[in-house]
């Protein structure tokens, strides 16, 4: 367990700015150009209009090191709080992605995080979307910085029989409650710096809520870095509301203007609130209780024989180890893509070309979805899970003619 009263040996650092300072490092560092794509740097605003079934989205790109079309697309959400969804093309969630693309985006993002943060540093990934991204950034930071005082944890919507560190809310989400558990890191002092990782930021409210909760639990935090793939928060001034001096970085920054259209009824009414928390009676620590080093574990079940191209599907919050498996197979020469199931209800159209609905393998009773998985594309599907034998919905297994691969017995 981390000790909030134990002081760490200070690491060399620059003077900390005032809490109200707004520091965005997205364009501050030397631009990274891709030799295969010299136009990667955007030096002029780009504007486009996206028509969705729930309304109209005006997208303005202000800068970045990745083009918009490589990073994300957009879809209509089944959510009255927010009618659109930013659909990442590099996360391995809603859109199938090659592992090397996921790795490159995480590495590029990690390179933009200030390397002189005072330690210990805690990297925090937001459930469910940014868990794999957060763990990948943690992995990259330890390599890039050559430091061992960089740790990882992530928020979760699963209740465990462990001590809760804090709780916070994601107001616009279909599943607003997040839990963070006390890290099981004996002898490790409480962090002095936070690196908060998410796929995108719009108003900054969720990041501020997370930061407030963590600073309340760890008052010794001195500075915060926020790292997101796409930053749409221009004009919201959220840095000034953060509880500690904050820098932010992204691969692309811009602005979104949403005009809601006529209300579109959800395709399926959920019998239970999508914010329901699950409960894991048995749990292996793949990140919820903190990690000092990156994990890379083979499945407990026998790995199926590979015949042809492959799709590896993570489930819910269990995404990092399936990604690592896919990455290893890709290095061995296999044609493999990664994606994952989601609690996010979205309409078909825009970035969503296919949609499967099925029961949650975590037992919450909340419908889950898999998008853009074409069962006729010739790929063999492996469904990866952490929830034990017999927890995967047979309807999903049959729809994809999938083989189930488990990391828990």
Give residue ranges: language-model regions.
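PRPP-associated nucleotide enzymes
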Residues: 1-409
């Amino acid at each position: 367990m981390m000790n909030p009263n134990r002081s760490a040996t200070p690491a060399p650092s620059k003077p900390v700015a005032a809490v109200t300072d707004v520091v965005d490092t997205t364009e501050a560092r030397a631009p990274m150009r891709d030799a295969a794509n010299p136009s990667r740097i955007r030096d002029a605003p780009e504007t486009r209009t996206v028509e969705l079934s729930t309304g109209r989205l005006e997208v303005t790109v202000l800068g970045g090191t990745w083009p918009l079309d490589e990073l994300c697309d957009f879809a209509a959400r089944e959510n009255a709080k927010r009618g659109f969804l930013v659909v990442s093309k590099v996360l391995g969630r809603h859109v199938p992605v090659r592992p090397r693309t996921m790795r490159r985006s995480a590495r590029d993002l990690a390179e933009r995080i200030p390397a002189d943060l005072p330690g210990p540093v805690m990297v925090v990934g937001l459930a469910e979307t940014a868990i794999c991204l957060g763990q990948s950034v943690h992995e990259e930071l330890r390599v890039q910085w050559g430091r061992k005082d960089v740790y990882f944890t992530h928020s979760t919507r699963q209740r465990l029989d462990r001590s809760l560190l804090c709780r916070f809310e994601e107001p616009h989400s279909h599943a607003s409650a997040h839990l963070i558990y006390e890290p099981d890191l004996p002898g490790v002092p409480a962090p002095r710096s936070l690196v908060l990782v998410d796929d995108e930021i719009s108003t900054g409210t969720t990041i501020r809520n997370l930061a407030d909760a963590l600073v309340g639990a760890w008052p010794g935090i001195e500075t915060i870095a926020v790292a997101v793939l796409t930053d749409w928060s221009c004009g919201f001034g959220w840095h000034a509301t953060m509880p500690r001096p904050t820098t932010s970085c992204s691969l692309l920054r811009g602005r979104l203007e949403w005009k809601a259209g006529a209300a579109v009824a959800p395709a399926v009414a959920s019998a239970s609130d999508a914010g329901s928390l699950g409960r894991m009676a048995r749990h292996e620590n793949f990140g919820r209780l903190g990690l000092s080093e990156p994990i890379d574990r083979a499945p407990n079940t026998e790995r199926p024989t590979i015949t042809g191209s492959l799709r590896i599907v993570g489930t819910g919050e269990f995404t990092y180890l399936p990604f690592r498996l896919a990455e290893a197979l890709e290095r061995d020469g296999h044609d493999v893509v990664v994606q994952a199931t989601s609690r996010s209800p979205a309409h078909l159209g825009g970035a969503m070309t296919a949609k499967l609905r099925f029961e949650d393998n975590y037992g919450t009773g909340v419908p889950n979805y898999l998008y853009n998985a074409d069962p006729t594309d010739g790929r063999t599907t492996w469904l990866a899970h952490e929830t034990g034998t017999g927890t995967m919905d047979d309807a999903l297994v049959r729809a994809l003619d999938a083989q189930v691969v488990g990391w828990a017995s």
